[in-house]
Amino acid sequence: MNHLEGSAEVEVTDEAAGGEVNESVEADLEHPEVEEEQQQPPQQQHYVGRHQRGRALEDLRAQLGQEEEERGECLARSASTESGFHNHTDTAEGDVIAAARDGYDAERAQDPEDESAYAVQYRPEAEEYTEQAEAEHAEATHRRALPNHLHFHSLEHEEAMNAAYSGYVYTHRLFHRGEDEPYSEPYADYGGLQEHVYEEIGDAPELDARDGLRLYEQERDEAAAYRQEALGARLHHYDERSDGESDSPEKEAEFAPYPRMDSYEQEEDIDQIVAEVKQSMSSQSLDKAAEDMPEAEQDLERPPTPAGGRPDSPGLQAPAGQQRAVGPAGGGEAGQRYSKEKRDAISLAIKDIKEAIEEVKTRTIRSPYTPDEPKEPIWVMRQDISPTRDCDDQRPMDGDSPSPGSSSPLGAESSSTSLHPSDPVEASTNKESRKSLASFPTYVEVPGPCDPEDLIDGIIFAANYLGSTQLLSDKTPSKNVRMMQAQEAVSRIKMAQKLAKSRKKAPEGESQPMTEVDLFISTQRIKVLNADTQETMMDHPLRTISYIADIGNIVVLMARRRMPRSNSQENVEASHPSQDGKRQYKMICHVFESEDAQLIAQSIGQAFSVAYQEFLRANGINPEDLSQKEYSDLLNTQDMYNDDLIHFSKSENCKDVFIEKQKGEILGVVIVESGWGSILPTVIIANMMHGGPAEKSGKLNIGDQIMSINGTSLVGLPLSTCQSIIKGLKNQSRVKLNIVRCPPVTTVLIRRPDLRYQLGFSVQNGIICSLMRGGIAERGGVRVGHRIIEINGQSVVATPHEKIVHILSNAVGEIHMKTMPAAMYRLLTAQEQPVYI
């Protein structure tokens, strides 16, 4: 018998068995680090003798087997030792009750104030072991004191001792806390705090069945209480592990996080039913045995404290069923304390279940493999690409069957549905992205037969392709010249068809057989597709279309192409910049026949207007801001032609001038066009021959506009015609000129309130090359063909083109410019040699 310092040794001998052999029951327990650091006071060490299981306990277990199955509990008992414990070949393996599957909170193991708490490593083989423990385990050959945090108490009274029965229950102290201590959950991870019950039962054929029943009920209640606590923890944290990370409750208990303490602090109202359940569960096991036992037998269960026991020593407290052996006073207090603790544990378990149910109702359980949905939609600006597809992807349908519900005219087919019947999703995506462009959801009403949305996607007309021809044209011919060119193209194609019918060789490039085609029109381009094969026959960007004419059921489409130039021509143009205005352009004229000729022409014209709106949108300008009413109000504030009407209406500015000269002598002047956009388009005196009749008279100045010569008006006539009229005065000795005095430099005043309003003219190399009719620039005095000399007092004669454009684009308010005809500027700067007439 070993003796430990500061502890009393107690030996319990089994006299009935007639043996003096004493064995110690060793518990394989692991001590947490917290308790290793804290030195506890020495405790009494208890040694027990060797006993055998009696038949009475087996009979008792048989009687209670049915109840065990109903409750789903398995009380595992063992009374032997197992090999391999503390450098010995025998190890005591304790009974692991079913509640050991569920861990208790590791926070109890980490609490330094609870000196009686300990951790026991759970071994999965314990369940299998307990089934065969009684038959297979060998006897222990050594004695050993139990750890000081194990609490060992004997269950004995006078009758039990006489029957040579002594039962011992090895257990740790329940998670008792003082009233002032904060509550901590008795839950733990896998391998956390566990309860192991070790029971040794000697040969006791006369064992009192009620004592065994009481022990069984106590152990079963403890198992049920801790199992419910662990179950509550698992239910409470199921929502935290609802992503499918665990495959089983065992694995869930193993990897479950610690309980959230804040969730237990929330107060809940427990109804009467839950209160009754708690009361029933907490008192069921304690009252059942007592109700069945006579009062006399109940009184016998309160013997004095066994010799050597220390009921008042710290850390030694038996469960409620065993505290009857402690004493009448201590037993009642300890029993109430234990009962209170059990009720607290049951209350917490019920509370956990209710919380888990509420959270499951309100929380969506989602698989971790489910991708997160974006919280808010993501909007992306449309890239600067053509909304129409390339020719290879186009599959138009016949134009005779327009799409239902479309506002396009009869005979037109929207390409958003007809070109791509197999890709409706992409077409709708383009529409939606286009609607979000610059946050302008609507279009300003554009006159025309088609829906602007359809023109952006593209519409298709059915037509017959008659042929194509080429013409040479000036850069900016008049409308009448355009119509004459269209008629000439039609006549050429008809002549070519007649030659083809007569089987005569037609001129090269002008004979094509009649072909059924689909004419694709959009704000980006115009394509001619073969109706059968859908191959692209011709493809012209919309910006290259210079003219469209409908003559009856004939449609003429003119596209501009610059004629290729040789190096010699480039050298000539470099030395003579005036040749730029006389440059010839190659016009490709396509002739079609269609019943919808007028609709085709109107649709192309509407496509230009919609394309302009798209341009405004791309630059952040709302087309609605440029409404007709608002723009009209702006024009009303603009000075008409910079007071040109007032200047021309003054009599002192308009004069009749008589020039005397010799017969056969030229007048000696150089004239240029006043420029398109002037209030009275006519010719201007750009230069005068030194010593000539015009200069010697002293009545003419450079910049004067000639209204008429000898009664013949020059207003609105081409420059070449005016030159011919002046040359015809060579044989006359007296010439009458009606002129309007004008300075050589024209002053322009444009009022632009903000950047929303476009100036309405374009500039190339400092020369105004186009002008929007009726715009603020035209009313301000801007004229086509004039060179910009000055902008807001700053000379731009030697300024690069890009800088001029930048200055004009960002100018607001009153914009003052000075311009003069480009030809006059070249003559005055000696860039050209004058040709006098």
Curated annotation (Swiss-Prot):
Gene3D superfamilies: 2.30.42.10, Pleckstrin-homology domain (PH domain)/Phosphotyrosine-binding domain (PTB) (2.30.29.30). Residues 457-643 form the PID domain. It is found in: Cytoplasm; Cytoplasm, Perinuclear region; Nucleus. The keyword Cell cycle does not apply. Residues 238-254, 387-398 have a biased composition (Basic and acidic residues). Residues 656-742, 747-822 form the PDZ domain. Residues 226-314 are annotated as: Munc-18-1 binding. GO terms for biological process: axo-dendritic transport; cell adhesion; chemical synaptic transmission; gamma-aminobutyric acid secretion; glutamate secretion; in utero embryonic development; intracellular protein transport; locomotory behavior. Residues 399-418 have a biased composition (Low complexity). Keywords: Cytoplasm, Golgi apparatus, Nucleus, Phosphoprotein, Protein transport, Repeat, Transport. Residues 626-641 are annotated as: Autoinhibitory helix linker. Its main location: cytoplasm. Residues 1-93, 238-342, 358-435 are annotated as: Disordered. GO terms for molecular function: amyloid-beta binding. The modification Phosphoserine is found at S78, S242, S246, S248, S263, S280, S285, S313, S367, S401, S403, S408, S568. It holds the Pfam family PDZ. It comes from the Eukaryota. Putative function in synaptic vesicle exocytosis by binding to Munc18-1, an essential component of the synaptic vesicle exocytotic machinery. May modulate processing of the amyloid-beta precursor protein (APP) and hence formation of APP-beta. Component of the LIN-10-LIN-2-LIN-7 complex, which associates with the motor protein KIF17 to transport vesicles containing N-methyl-D-aspartate (NMDA) receptor subunit NR2B along microtubules. Composed of an N-terminal domain that binds Munc18-1 and LIN-2/CASK, a middle phosphotyrosine-binding domain (PID/PTB) that mediates binding with the cytoplasmic domain of the amyloid-beta precursor protein, and two C-terminal PDZ domains thought to attach proteins to the plasma membrane. This is Amyloid-beta A4 precursor protein-binding family A member 1. The gene is APBA1.
